[in-house]
């Protein structure tokens, strides 16, 4: 009940299908991350945060309506174990537990973009604004792998044959929330602009 109140006070509803048996402090950090980014991006709709069993390789997921964030219940047990698993293969940008919720909030925020720009468009604009260099999509993906994470450059083919990069915004948001740099800060500034903020 205390955790429900803690979340509600921050505008987050805990969606607990099953009792929470993890580390309450770790869950509070996830709640704080969701609440911080909800406020920063002026998200008015209520957001739900929940936990459930997932494949051990998955740390979280976001519902298709962009209103529910799920964290793998295993990632909410012991911070040291979670952070060791996050950094094990260097596949993800996050190396702290807070990076998980920040990544999932990136999916929520992606649904708020109003000007039709993709994460790839915003990243290319970021590189130009910071370094003065115009880059191709292919160069952008290489830079993402090199400077953000391998996962950030993951390409998903859509049913209509168009390839999309759905992980750029979540991964850069994760970086900006946990260990910001001049590129992540500029990316977030442009992302806010794309969301009409």
Where are these regions (language model features)?
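Active-site-flanking segments in enzyme catalytic domains
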Residues: 1-197
């Amino acid at each position: 009940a205390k955790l429900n109140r803690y979340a509600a006070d921050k505008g987050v509803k805990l969606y607990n299908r099953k009792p929470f048996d993890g580390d309450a402090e770790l869950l509070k950090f996830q709640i704080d991350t969701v609440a911080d980014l909800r406020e920063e991006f002026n998200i008015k709709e209520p957001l739900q945060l929940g936990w459930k069993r997932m494949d051990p390789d998955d740390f979280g997921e976001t519902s298709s309506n962009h209103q529910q964030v799920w964290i793998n219940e295993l990632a909410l047990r012991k911070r040291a174990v979670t952070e060791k698993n996050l950094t094990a293969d260097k596949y993800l940008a996050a190396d702290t537990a807070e990076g998980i919720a920040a990544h999932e909030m990136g999916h929520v925020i992606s649904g708020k973009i109003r000007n039709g720009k993709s994460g790839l468009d915003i990243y290319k604009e970021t590189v130009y604004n910071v370094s003065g260099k115009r880059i191709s999509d292919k160069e952008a993906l290489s830079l993402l792998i090199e400077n953000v994470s391998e996962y950030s450059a993951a390409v998903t083919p859509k049913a209509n044959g168009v390839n999309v990069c759905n992980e750029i915004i979540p991964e850069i948001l994760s970086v900006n929330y946990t260990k910001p740099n001049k590129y992540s800060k500029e990316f977030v500034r442009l992302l806010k602009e794309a969301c009409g903020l």
